[in-house]
């Protein structure tokens, strides 16, 4: 395997056995591809903005003599880049400009004669743009649009499973769901009549819809029934025989023909009888006259002579009617073929309950149902019905819907119209009747072939279309108003409705969510999330068990593990590692093709529907060298079931063992040894891990860490290979390799790093370079680590030395005992950054002012503010400190004569303002790391704002000039090369100042041309620099666009360092969570023979009942990894020669049976081996992929190599007494995370504070500075103790007895410790409520 430069620094030993056929795909592609499809111009007009425009335009006037046509659109450049948008609190978006053409036709001339054409580009609002990492910046905050899993459009056949009717009869129904438009449902009732509903309204007999489609009774019967034909010959009744129809019936008369009796009366007709009848080719048999009674006529019979109707279609025959028919000369009678088994009389029965008899009455019935209370007219009824399912504007099945519809009805073509046809409706009814007759199956709506993914692009397009349709109405009216000669397209389009629709979607849709930015994993998982909730989806309350359950089709598409606990379980899922969506939006997963029993590396992506037709082997099936299956019987999946198949039946094989799980679950080592419930918690808790001060890669990982870290976008990744030319904390400069340069560019890539910025969850985002000067890098190499990444690998927590043993009850109930060393070494110290904002507004009484001159505040409180009243950067502040001084004008108060006198003498005016400064919230303390001042245009900037501006300008200038210098240096080195090649001596050249080089002339014409080109580039560079600097200067100095009424905003950023402390929540990766109970001194912790104390003591009782054994295996393997690191460390300390190191490290990498990873250290230089060893001294990182991990034997081998006991247990000694514990203890290294549930954010205390208005009781919760509720169970406790006075105090003066409270306060101040309880306010509320019921209760004071 070829390792890149960064990977060589620390290679993870991989225990995976299965070959990696397919690399993990780019993890954010579901978001990026979808949005790309939305904004890029699609010449076919299938997707995105183009499709939306084409569906609405051209817009024609009502009169038809003018129309507005769409030509093309373009997106402009965003005004601010992503970082600026976040700082300023604006949306990162680009203006949308659309070219429209207004065509005016001649009125009197023949149709289509053009009078005038005007073309113009029209602004249509802003379209939010996606950042490179798949997020949107909306009003300065990063948001993610979650994909939605909704029911695919198409037709679905379902049953109520016997739950609707008390008899338990199964009622079948069919539902046609369009992408947009009215739903059409067909359903059976318990009497077996077929009904139809439109948009889930009241039901009508299904034949009404057929009548509305202009079918007569005769035609309807013709469509749905086979015929039985009777003939009257020589006063005998004969029936045309179709032998197959008799199967299973009991003969009610002798069946005979040609004198031979085939079936005797009363006998059951069997397949043998039918074969005989067919063999003898019997066409007609004689039947008794009574047999026809009760049969149903298939058409109208009219007496030719009188024109009178003898019997209408769908009437039951009686013997009288038969006689009448015979008399009037009808010798051939067609009846409907029905039986109780597989040809039910449903449509015939439905026609009997159908009140309508022609098209008009059917249309009127439908109109009455859709618009109750409105008088129907013929035109209204017709247009309503036409618009329901047959109008392109109101109804669209979409390409997906049509494909699913045709597949469901077993048609050959998969394309077709987006509206319904007569055939569509009839075919659905036929199939539904077939299912009722026992032919065919109902659909499974939880099958992933019936649910599809709607991603960002599609949802944004729908929203945009909604906006356009709103505009369309207005445009139509404007076009009809006349006087078009002076109008331009711009005057017709109002961009407000469009931008409002888009803004509403991105800002407040249920699926537009505040990005979870705790750590890189939580970002990636949030973008790969799939929700069944949201507009057009399910609701929590209505979703039953089936929808939430794991379905066989989830395999490889949706993760069976990662889903929230609680009310959303199973409704919010995560995309599997390799899954992607196909053109129709269905999830597909990759498989390896098996050809003639040989597994190839050819990859096919299959959707859930396609997968049902194949036999698919598991990824862990054993293969030989050529790719044949080793075993004769292979475990495979087929049609949702798992069973054994012979090896020549296999069609496909899984691509990878981690194909089943999501990114979050694929990071849990030994997942295969954990119970699923705990694995779910483990996957969810990794997303809550707070990035620690120094990231520490997991010793035991799964090999997915690198993919997650790189794809999440928190690291800086090299766009092109080259050599590191410059590196400091905030930027990295790469001189690009010659072969990767574009012709005529300087070949310098500059990466500016993010420093100490705040994430959505108030954690700290900071990038640190992990390359050094002169290092070669390749494209895709990690240049700088972000939060929670370590050398380009995801590192959410810390490797801790843990022991599983009880320790004095401090690990009771999942508590965790932590050594003081962990605190000393700052292993779990995290930085949190808070943003506090102070807004100065224009009030009715005058503007608020930001100033250091605040009334009634001492000098000490102002010591940290500058003269503008804003806190200094670097100041350490605690709760209650002033950060920004602000005064608000106060209303004029009535002054006493004395005050008036003083005013007159001293001109004192200070009491007109009140202090409304921004203070640090209680319980928060930290360091000010940044201050930003935003000033409205036209408001004078204060001194601090100007200082910040000056600083930013300086920084921008410095950045740009450094960039220019680097680029110049690159350019001049190329100029020098050209000059030297052209015959100029190098020494002379170096004596000349560089600017003069370009004036030199060369005799070689080609070289001279090159030189001139380079000179042009140099001029361009300088010009570009000036332009960039000017743009930057303009951006920095221009006023900010603030909300109306806001003059100034000051934002202060506080950094808070939080050490780990009792009450913080910690967890491993296997769902093993707990709260820290005590920080124990190092000397009291259990220690081993070498005197090494453990860091954490966990309770062994937390393992067996929870069945997450993965944590034990991780502990053992972590111990082995650390043991090998210790040996390497010892060798380095002894300064042993490189060869020995190389040999030992090679042995460690080669360990394990037939692992896929082959590390060949002989290709590494000595320097590289030394660097590798240096990075391995803290432990050799190990990958144990999900379902393909290290075996127990391999762990033991590794322990042996590290000179450790293969049991994984060692003798420990009690730190307090020095005595040995009575039995060996499992000790090892486990990766522990600190979760974002910190005791600092939860701890809260109150003495007095705010009260609720109505009940006068204290509020609840930390945010409201509330009290602790003394609830009814606590009252019972005090009652049980008989503590009457304590209880009285609790319910009166300590709660809501207003007078008692104030009196008590007064008494305490006076030193008189007595109390008089009064009437609690909540009792008065109760009295008022009872009075509202009309019962008067009064309290009589005796």
Curated annotation (Swiss-Prot):
Organism: Escherichia fergusonii (strain ATCC 35469 / DSM 13698 / CCUG 18766 / IAM 14443 / JCM 21226 / LMG 7866 / NBRC 102419 / NCTC 12128 / CDC 0568-73)
Cystine residue pairs: none
Reaction equations catalysed: RNA(n) + a ribonucleoside 5'-triphosphate = RNA(n+1) + diphosphate
HAMAP family in UniProt: RNApol_bact_RpoB
Gene: rpoB
EC id: 2.7.7.6
Top-level enzyme category: transferase
Protein name: DNA-directed RNA polymerase subunit beta
Record bears the keyword Magnesium: no
Entries under CDD domains matching the protein: RNA_pol_B_RPB2 (cd00653)
GO MF term set: DNA binding; DNA-directed RNA polymerase activity; ribonucleoside binding
Gene Ontology BP term (one): DNA-templated transcription
Its job: DNA-dependent RNA polymerase catalyzes the transcription of DNA into RNA using the four ribonucleoside triphosphates as substrates.
Gene3D superfamilies in the cross-refs: 2.40.50.100, 2.40.50.150, 3.90.1100.10, 6.10.140.1670, DNA-directed RNA polymerase, beta subunit, external 1 domain, DNA-directed RNA polymerase, subunit 2, domain 6, RNA polymerase alpha subunit dimerisation domain, RNA polymerase Rpb2, domain 2
One cellular component term from this protein's GO annotations in UniProt: DNA-directed RNA polymerase complex
Pfam family, one: RNA_pol_Rpb2_1
InterPro entries attached to this UniProt entry: DNA-dir_RNA_pol_bsu_ext_1_sf, DNA-dir_RNA_pol_bsu_external_1, DNA-dir_RNA_pol_su2, DNA-dir_RNAP_su2_dom, DNA-dir_RNAP_su2_hyb_sf, RNA_pol_bsu_bac, RNA_pol_bsu_CS, RNA_pol_bsu_protrusion
Subunit structure: The RNAP catalytic core consists of 2 alpha, 1 beta, 1 beta' and 1 omega subunit. When a sigma factor is associated with the core the holoenzyme is formed, which can initiate transcription.
Protein family per UniProt: Belongs to the RNA polymerase beta chain family.
Keywords: Acetylation, DNA-directed RNA polymerase, Nucleotidyltransferase, Transcription, Transferase
